[in-house]
Amino acid sequence: MEAIWLYQFRLIVIGDSTVGKSCLIRRFTEGRFAQVSDPTVGVDFFSRLVEIEPGKRIKLQIWDTAGQERFRSITRAYYRNSVGGLLLFDITNRRSFQNVHEWLEETKVHVQPYQIVFVLVGHKCDLDTQRQVTRHEAEKLAAAYGMKYIETSARDAINVEKAFTDLTRDIYELVKRGEITIQEGWEGVKSGFVPNVVHSSEEVVKSERRCLC
Amino acid sequence: MSDKDDTETPVVTKATPSPEDGNCEPARNSESADQSTKPESKSEPVASTRKRPEARSSHDLDTADIHPVQESQALGKDPFSKEVAQTGWGYWGSWGKSLLSSASATVATVGQGISNVIEKAENSLGIPSPVEISTQVQYASGDTNTKGNESTSPVAGPFGVFSTISTAVQSTGKSVISGGLDALEFIGKKTMDVIAEGDPGFRKTKGLINRNSTLSQVLREAKEKEELRTTNEVTMETDRKTHYGLLFDEFQGLSHLEALEMLSRESEIKVKSILNSLSGEELDTLKLDLEQLKETFSLEEFCDEEEEEKKGDEDFTKEIMELFSQLHISCRPEKLTRARNAAYEWIETPLKKPLVEKEEEEKYLEIQSTEQVNKKSVECLFFQDIHAFAIRSLAELTAYSIELFHKTAALVLHGQKQEVTAIERSRALSQMTVVLCKDLSIMSKEFTTCLTSAGVKEKADVLNPLITAVFLEASNSASYIQDAFQLLLPVLEISLIESKTQLPQA
């Protein structure tokens, strides 16, 4: 456990039931793959530090949400305080891909007046033989919504690290440029504690935050 | 046990295990623990010990009130008014009085952000009832007369071990500050109220301020303060290892607590609006039902239970599993039981084979700091490890307990159709709370026994703060768990209301 981090970002992980949200997060935070896992109840919490540049660490608080419809009223409450999100679908499950834009609509309504930086994640890419969604169409959809697209596998640990760190880096850039600012009453980004290094001007505390979806 | 090596004195002494080192075996009885901790009790400021963050309302003072239910009825005619919510629960004795009243008071706040405290318009807040004021006065006057009052206080609660410890309380001006063993004293009785202001007016002010924050806010603030403090100091690494709040957060306890508070708050708002929409007989029947449900949340079991023996791992696991199955929800408490049993395993290891443990420790140290090992530092490291592990375990188990309550709330609200009544669920949950808290208190005793035997050579002023800290955090843990339990009340109220309104339709 390392205490010093520059910022804390809250990330939310959403997507249909059984696309592998919890498994992806567990692979990222615990470094292992759980063969069987119970469906998530409501929301679960994880955290990990990510080093985006030598000596610059970001603490990620990751909200794992239940994909099941019946918990939707609980999970909705978490959009508002997230700065970033991973929107997952299962590449072997066409339905979960078709639901992507519903998820985006859902978040749009509940994240007001803020914005979430999303990355689209095609999960279970180890099961390429059962693929029902091509990389091309997924990339197209992602581009239409201004998202990046990445394919991951929690089982084979493919791109898991990259999915989270790329998103973290993107958010960090936006924070550095002042497009995302720390705000009172919003928990998406929090300033952390910096070692005895120069803090530079990254610490922006303006009250305005621009759109970036 | 992979602690940083804290040897400050580079005395070159060969660390040979001498027979006197094997001091871990005999002192399993708390008697010796008491002996060794007693002398310094008055003068020692407890450096590493942090008082439980304050968000207590003046209600916490009414430890003397024995029939809160009756009292609440006398106070507020409407059983759903604030008064009742705050006074109705707290019966089960004088220990572990908690943030509950403020926690349940705050869940009523509409639209309150997690860390965004909005002024509340409720004018009843912070104004203690006449009964409270009188108990405050009682309390205040009781403090000056320490021996007489304190020793007769019932210490039969889970922390009953302290009944054997004589306590000393010094009165300094407007605060009653107790030193050294003070933490032990209030665990037995008033938990966090030991540092009670003699000035009721001051308390009143404080009550007003604190009513607006939830337990998780208070904890978060305390944690953040600690994070800030530790980054500013060199001692960070070791400090963090033993800081309950930081560890509690690391195990996601804070997040689960916040989530539970959110569900509780939403449910409470719903309950209120439902009650507002009803009238006449319908309303009266429902109120009666809700009153019944509330009674199951009074945790009376704490009172009449005697000091219990430590349960075996299987017993505890079985009991929790059994209680959990009575809830009929699709989630199991394995994470908690596993962590709990692992903690007990750890405790028992050094006790059973202290010499082996110690030799390993020394070997480890020899590798670590080559020649700079002296015998004292070996022991020092050893009991500090126990302390760190104890705090860590308490934080972990508390976090997992709260996680369980959070999951329970989510499933009660959004689970499958229920096969059990809300009352049955509350009873199981209430019992679970008792079991969890008792187990924590027993565990803390095991830890301190362990600590005492490992550090028997230490001066009391080194050992005492650590022992105090363990007991203090165990007490805090129990309070948090009870607070979390109380947050389930509105959730079960909703569940009850839903089952009532669904039945005729079906």
UniProtKB/Swiss-Prot annotation, chain A:
Cofactors: Mg(2+)
Region named Switch-I: 35-43
Lipidation positions, renumbered (S-geranylgeranyl cysteine): C211, C213
Entry-annotated residues carrying Phosphoserine: S201
Record keywords, A-Z: Autism spectrum disorder, Autophagy, Cell membrane, Cytoplasmic vesicle, Disease variant, Golgi apparatus, GTP-binding, Hydrolase, Intellectual disability, Lipoprotein, Lysosome, Magnesium, Membrane, Metal-binding, Methylation, Nucleotide-binding, Parkinson disease, Phosphoprotein, Prenylation, Protein transport, Transport
Effect listed in the UniProt record for changing Q68L: Constitutively active mutant locked in the active GTP-bound form
Expressed in which tissues: Highly expressed in the brain.
Disease: Intellectual developmental disorder, X-linked 72: A disorder characterized by significantly below average general intellectual functioning associated with impairments in adaptive behavior and manifested during the developmental period. Intellectual deficiency is the only primary symptom of non-syndromic X-linked forms, while syndromic forms present with associated physical, neurological and/or psychiatric manifestations. XLID72 patients can manifest autism spectrum disorder, seizures and macrocephaly as additional features.
Catalytic activity: GTP + H2O = GDP + phosphate + H(+)
Biological process terms in GO annotation: autophagy; protein transport; Rab protein signal transduction; regulation of autophagy; synapse organization; vesicle-mediated transport
Residue ranges, annotated region (Switch-II): 67-83
GO MF annotation terms: GTP binding; GTPase activity; myosin V binding
Species annotation: Homo sapiens (Human)
Residues modified to Cysteine methyl ester: C213
Annotated binding of Mg(2+), by residue: S22, T40, D64
Activity regulation as described: Regulated by guanine nucleotide exchange factors (GEFs) including C9orf72-SMCR8 complex, which promote the exchange of bound GDP for free GTP. Regulated by GTPase activating proteins (GAPs) which increase the GTP hydrolysis activity. Inhibited by GDP dissociation inhibitors (GDIs).
Protein name: Ras-related protein Rab-39B
UniProt function note: The small GTPases Rab are key regulators of intracellular membrane trafficking, from the formation of transport vesicles to their fusion with membranes. Rabs cycle between an inactive GDP-bound form and an active GTP-bound form that is able to recruit to membranes different sets of downstream effectors directly responsible for vesicle formation, movement, tethering and fusion. RAB39B is involved in autophagy and may function in autophagosome formation.
Record-listed E.C. numbers: 3.6.5.2
Entry domain remark: Switch I, switch II and the interswitch regions are characteristic of Rab GTPases and mediate the interactions with Rab downstream effectors. The switch regions undergo conformational changes upon nucleotide binding which drive interaction with specific sets of effector proteins, with most effectors only binding to GTP-bound Rab.
GO CC field: cytoplasmic vesicle membrane; Golgi apparatus; neuron projection; plasma membrane; vesicle
NCBIfam families associated with the record: small_GTP
Protein topology in the membrane: Lipid-anchor
Annotated consequence of substituting S22N: Dominant negative mutant
